[in-house]
Amino acid sequence: MAKQPTRDDVARLAGTSTAVVSYVVNGGPRNVRPETRKRVLEAIEQLGYRPNASAQSLSRGRSDLFALLVPDLANPYLAELAQRLEEEFFRRDMVLVVGDSHDDQDRESTILEAFRRQQIAGLAWYGVTQPLPLDLLEDASFPVVLLNEPDGHRMGNHPRITRLVADEQEAARVATEHLLQHGRARVAMVAGPKGRHNARERIRGWRLALREAGLEEGAVIHGPFTRAGGVQAAQTLIDSGADAVVVSNELQATGLLRELHCAGVAVPEEIAIVALNGTALSEFLWPPVTSVDVPVSSQAEAIADFVTGTDRAHDLSVTSRLTKRASCGCSYSSKE
């Protein structure tokens, strides 16, 4: 096997020092004269030299790796976010690495520590608990975007931590109001686990819409943000006499639709459905599910801008939008 060219080989061919080669490869810390830089780059190309990524990370104090830590990559919303972030960072000559905590706090802490050892350039974190245990990032030197840190909770004094703000309450209010516009009067809520901040916020939005319409609250059914959570909610929903339901995410909606179909309950004729945090998958469920969506591409761009330093706003905000399909009773064609 041919010997891999080294930095010494590049320096020898370019007629300069290994330190100067390092400055060219790492983009600093010292400037290099244009003619010298040209010789070094030509030597690198001629020899086929490939810089050691780990060594570059050590010299710069960071790598070209951006990390995403989520509790469940099976969640279509989080999977789509990972895909969009990968595309966004690839355009910026960075690589995305993804950790899945499986909704386990110990696993989450282990992954965070592994990311830190890799000297990542930045982190987007959707945590298992709320508020997030920010003490784990107390001395972090990289920018961090918190994807589900509750508004109003302490952010510490870390100048490079920001929060991506999505108005969960407003999204649930919009979903509920849309069902009311279809003449539904007994609107239930399939929420997330008890105690989760985003579950509480969605319930608040649902209650607000019902209160403003002068209607009594329907059933609130708690369960995990999974297909199994939707499956488990189905019988309670049927027994409650609801004629409509706001479902907290697309995974729950998938499980719920299957169970309603198995029980012979027609959607939307008997129970209309609107899901929160929808993705492109909602169009391919049956019936296609009306959803309140977060623009994932906009989220990914905002995260990348913050991490790369082009936007250092304290909070990054995104606005949800209602996508009308058939599960609520709207007329819908996939060709529209």
Residue ranges and their predicted role:
Residues 18-22, 59-72, 178, 186-193:
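Short beta-strand segments enriched in small/hydrophobic residues
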Residues 1-2, 65-177, 235-240:
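Alpha-helical recognition/docking segments in bacterial nutrient-uptake
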Residues 186-187, 217-219, 266-272:
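Short acidic capping loops at alpha-helix termini that bridge into adjacent secondary structure
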Residues 53, 71-80, 98-107, 162-174, ...:
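Hinge/beta->alpha junction and helix N-cap segments in small-molecule ligand-binding domains
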